[in-house]
């Protein structure tokens, strides 16, 4: 609806320019917001106040001319001026009801992408395969997954790329330690302890470190024995990752893995091509690109090092090769990198070097979707009691157990299998939702007590809200798609719920554009609250007439489907009862 209003305002502005009321060359960002007071309309715009000065008019006078120039629309019943010059738009409830009836008959609930479909690469998760996934991998994995789901739902062709760390000195270290300490595959499955022991040897023994580096050289040269050991490590680590992805209900598979090693053959070409473009400068033996846009505190350009003095390559080299592959081979229109906010400088440099070098042959928009850190309840980095890294699988297991105990306490009569299933859905959902509901760029503190609360903006609350809607239809023995009739909006609570339901597509487009799942979380929480008010004030099963009951059932059905679909787009499973 906001897009419709923006289009109407734009047409009015064009007319006022033609009439000489407004000067040519204006290109204002037309803002349309939800009205705070529904008695003054459903939507409001401050466009008249924005353009009053260039028009040489008082805001209210310009607002009046804008209203007169607005094209007629079946979606708008009237437009009024409020305060210093706000335009308040009142939605036509009959048109709104028709939109919701159409949404109920649509698999996509009326949501359509604002713009043409695109091919989008999502760079997400990217764990270091030398050790197990830890809590620091959670945000990239689940935020990337949610945005990928939303883009696919809106019609984009999404290519997930799990840029795992599967190359480098760390693997030489592991191979050297394995040569010293032959162990079984079962023992090797505990990668964390194996890595810790190998790292200790690497730090304490120069002879061991030299041997480890030598094994890396042999690995890079394609030595069969080293490749076999490397493949063994990689397969074990990827199997660990896959179990975690499945528990998280994340749509990542082995087919999505495109690790650092995949670009090895192109790294020398990257350096050669940068040199051919005249972009390389040798600095202390290293090959660097200097960009004037990026300077240090002393005002000197910062180097983007693509090859060390010893001939080794760096993350920037691999990332440049990945950019070229994603643009020229995958032919992506967008590439979204869900990587820690602290890597912003690195990616801004890589993107600019790629553009300068002509690596982006197919026009591709590159965006670093940075995120903040997850801290402990004390606001400090999330660690175990002894200061170690918290394994992600351990955190998720604890979440399941805590949720199971909570659900068992509330529903002791349920069978244990059902309690376990509910516990897993609630526990995993709670961890994911607590993260996704925060702004992507914000840091947040992890707190089991808050995220497992059945009140407030939490997964348990939303999961319960969905079961409440499902319960209405279970009593009637109907599904959400088995309600005839038409939606008719009379009561204020019906209209409030209907207006919010109609915004689902707009919310999804916001998430798709900005990579911000918290917007969808806020929407679902608000929707659940509006349904609760509607349910309490507008009797469904005890409606006054059959047509009123059908109308309210249809509103409830669309609410249920929207909640379920929204939670699914966040990567959360739903329950029919709790």
From Swiss-Prot:
One of its GO terms (cellular component) is cytoplasm. A motif ('HIGH' region) lies at residues 127-137. It catalyses: tRNA(Arg) + L-arginine + ATP = L-arginyl-tRNA(Arg) + AMP + diphosphate. Its EC number is 6.1.1.19. GO terms for biological process: arginyl-tRNA aminoacylation. Pfam families: Arg_tRNA_synt_N (PF03485), DALR_1 (PF05746), tRNA-synt_1d (PF00750). It comes from the Bacteria. The keyword Mitochondrion does not apply. Transmembrane segments: none annotated. Keywords: Aminoacyl-tRNA synthetase, ATP-binding, Cytoplasm, Ligase, Nucleotide-binding, Protein biosynthesis. The keyword Aminoacyl-tRNA synthetase applies. GO terms for molecular function: arginine-tRNA ligase activity; ATP binding. Belongs to the class-I aminoacyl-tRNA synthetase family. NCBIfam families: argS. This is Arginine--tRNA ligase. The gene is argS.
């Amino acid at each position: 609806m906001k897009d419709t209003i923006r289009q109407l305002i734009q047409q009015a502005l064009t007319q006022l320019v033609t009439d000489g009321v407004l000067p040519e060359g204006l290109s204002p960002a037309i803002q349309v917001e939800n009205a705070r007071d529904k008695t003054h309309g459903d939507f409001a715009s401050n466009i008249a106040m924005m353009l009053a000065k260039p028009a040489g008019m008082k805001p209210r006078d310009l607002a009046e001319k804008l209203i007169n120039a607005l094209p007629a629309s079946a979606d708008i019943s009237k437009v009024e001026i409020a305060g210093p010059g706000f335009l308040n738009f009142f939605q036509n409830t009959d048109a709104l009801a028709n939109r919701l009836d159409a949404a109920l008959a649509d698999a996509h609930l009326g949501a359509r992408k604002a713009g043409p479909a695109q091919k989008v690469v999502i760079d997400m998760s990217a764990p270091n395969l030398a050790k197990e996934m830890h809590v620091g991998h959670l945000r990239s994995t689940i935020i990337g997954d949610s945005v990928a789901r939303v883009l696919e739902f809106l019609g984009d062709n999404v290519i997930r790329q799990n840029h795992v760390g599967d190359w480098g000195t760390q693997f030489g270290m592991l191979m050297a330690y394995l040569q010293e300490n032959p162990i079984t595959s079962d023992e090797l499955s505990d990668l964390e302890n194996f890595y810790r022991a190998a790292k200790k040897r690497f730090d304490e023994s120069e002879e061991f470190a030299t041997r480890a580096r030598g094994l890396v050289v042999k690995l890079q040269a394609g030595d069969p024995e080293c490749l076999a050991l490397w493949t063994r490590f990689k397969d074990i680590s990827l199997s660990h990752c896959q179990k975690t992805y499945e528990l998280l209900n994340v749509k990542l598979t082995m087919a999505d893995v495109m690790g650092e090693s995949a670009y090895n053959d192109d790294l020398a070409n990257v350096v050669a091509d940068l040199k051919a473009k005249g972009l390389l400068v040798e600095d202390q033996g290293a090959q660097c690109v200097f960009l004037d846009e990026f300077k240090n505190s002393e005002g000197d350009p910062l180097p983007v090092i693509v090859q060390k003095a010893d001939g080794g390559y760096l993350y920037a080299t691999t990332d440049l090769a990945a950019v070229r592959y994603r643009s020229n081979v995958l032919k992506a229109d967008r590439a979204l990198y869900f990587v820690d906010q602290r890597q912003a400088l690195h990616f801004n440099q890589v993107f600019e070097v790629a553009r300068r070098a002509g690596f982006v042959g197919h026009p591709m928009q590159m965006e670093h979707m940075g995120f903040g850190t997850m801290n402990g309840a004390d606001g400090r980095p999330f660690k175990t009691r002894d200061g170690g890294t918290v394994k992600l699988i351990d955190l998720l297991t604890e979440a399941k157990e805590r949720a199971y105990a909570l659900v068992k306490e509330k529903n002791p009569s349920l069978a244990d299998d059902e309690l376990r299933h509910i516990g897993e859905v609630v526990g995993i959902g709670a961890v994911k939702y607590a993260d996704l509901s925060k702004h992507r760029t914000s840091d947040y503190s992890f707190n089991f007590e808050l995220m497992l609360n059945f009140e407030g903006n939490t997964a348990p609350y939303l999961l319960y809200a969905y079961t409440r809607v499902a319960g209405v239809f279970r009593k009637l023995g109907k599904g959400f798609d088995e309600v005839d009739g038409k939606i008719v909006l009379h009561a204020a609570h019906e209209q409030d719920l209907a207006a919010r339901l109609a915004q689902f597509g707009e919310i999804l487009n916001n998430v798709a554009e900005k990579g911000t799942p918290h917007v969808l979380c806020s929407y679902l929480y608000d929707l659940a609250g509006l349904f609760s008010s509607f349910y309490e004030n507008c009797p469904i099963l005890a409606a006054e007439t059959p047509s009123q009951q059908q109308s309210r059932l249809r509103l409830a059905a669309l609410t249920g489907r929207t909640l379920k679909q929204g939670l699914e787009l966040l990567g959360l499973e739903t329950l029919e009862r709790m």
